[in-house]
A protein has these predicted regions:
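Short, Asp-centered acidic motifs that coordinate Mg2+ and/or phosphate
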Residues: 82-86, 123, 196-197, 215-216, ...
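Hinge/capping helix and adjacent helix->loop/strand transition within the periplasmic-binding protein
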Residues: 77-83, 90, 98-185, 234-236, ...
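N-terminal (or domain-start) structured segment
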Residues: 20-109, 147-150, 156, 172-201, ...
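An extracytoplasmic/periplasmic, membrane-proximal ligand-sensing/linker region
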Residues: 24-26, 171, 210, 258-319
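C-terminal lobe and pocket-closing loops
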Residues: 204-273, 302-305
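Bacterial N-terminal signal peptides
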Residues: 8-17
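Bacterial N-terminal signal peptides that target proteins for export
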Residues: 1-9
Length: 319
């Protein structure tokens, strides 16, 4: 056999061996937000078990800025070898592409979906100062007072802005948006009655609801949430088909080899089947909701136009 053929075979075997050995070094998970937030909690919960499955350390790296865009760019430019992943939320994956006209990345163009890991429903809240007890009460109350009811959000273009816009579209209500710099000041004004309505993630909403500081009227998931078991879903409350939830997922740079993607996706599946992980995830306010690489890609393709419509309806732009 000619020497050049032997060399080609040797190189092919070396390449196959390299892929088969993945991973051989620590894996970096980039988060486009500061430490201490919900994504950080989610990353650390999964990293603890993921490194046991893969046999390599999982290092969480924070690259915050521009609504997650800085972190996304960092991962997009990384080698497509499976050693750099991004943990992203709804905003980074499907809201930002509609919010920024000059966004430096396209989610399905510049990234390879690895796994969806969680869904995060929200609660629809009102100030206790309003004389309403149910979502139907609130809808009727607001319809009788067009333009007199304000809703607060953590800022323009975020999920706490867009979910109320979806609610407005579904009900035909006219409410005025009051954006804040984060959810904390918005909650303060909701408690005080300066704004009357808000959509917020379950953990914080449940805590304030149980203290009587706000009143939860409905949750936005298809099923009731364990943290608010007595609160009906929006669908139960008469809003047919109103299921709006945020989600978390892991992505790699576009061009990551299929066998590496499969190894990572399978590892996440094993971790997500761990009862301890699922229980702790629920305690953090997220619903375990695994999708493998292909299904996650289809999910993102379906969610993108939905959120794009909400952004357009809101009029939000962040260029």
């Amino acid at each position: 056999m000619p020497t050049r053929h032997l060399a080609a075979i040797a190189l092919a075997l070396l390449a196959a061996s390299a892929h088969a050995a993945f991973p051989e070094k620590p894996i970096r998970v980039v988060i486009g937000f500061p430490a201490g937030g919900p994504l950080d909690q989610h990353a650390r919960l999964l990293a603890e078990k993921l490194q046991a499955v893969l046999g390599q350390p999982i290092v969480v790296d924070y690259k915050s800025g521009a609504g997650g865009t800085v972190g996304a760019q960092d991962v997009m430019k990384a080698p497509a070898d499976g050693y750099t992943l991004m943990l992203a939320n709804t905003g980074v994956m499907v809201i930002n592409p509609a919010l920024y006209s000059k966004l430096p990345y396209g989610t399905l163009k510049d990234f390879t979906p690895i796994a969806r890991t969680a869904m995060q429903p929200l609660a629809l809240l009102v100030t206790p100062k309003l004389p309403v007890k149910t979502l139907k009460d609130f809808t009727e109350y607001t319809k009788a007072r067009p333009g007199q009811i304000n809703y607060g959000s953590a800022g323009n273009g975020g999920i706490s802005h867009l979910v109320p816009e979806m609610f407005k579209s579904a009900t035909g209500l006219f409410m005025v948006h009051i954006p804040y710099r984060g959810s904390a000041p918005a909650f303060t004004d909701l408690m005080g009655g300066q704004v009357q309505f808000m959509a917020e993630s379950i953990p914080q909403a449940a805590s304030y609801h149980k203290q009587g500081k706000v009143r939860a009227l409905a949750v936005t998931s298809r099923e009731r949430n364990p943290a608010l078991p007595d609160i009906p879903t929006a669908i139960e409350s008469g809003l047919k088909g109103f299921e709006v939830v945020g989600f978390y997922g892991f992505l790699a740079p576009a061009g990551t080899p299929p066998d590496v993607v499969a190894t990572l996706s399978d590892a996440f599946k094993q971790v997500m089947n761990n009862p301890e992980v699922r229980s702790r995830m629920v305690s953090q306010g997220a619903d375990p909701a695994f999708l493998g690489s292909a299904d996650f890609g289809k999910f993102l393709a379906a969610e993108t136009p939905r959120w794009e419509k909400a952004v357009k309806a809101s009029g939000a732009r962040l260029d």
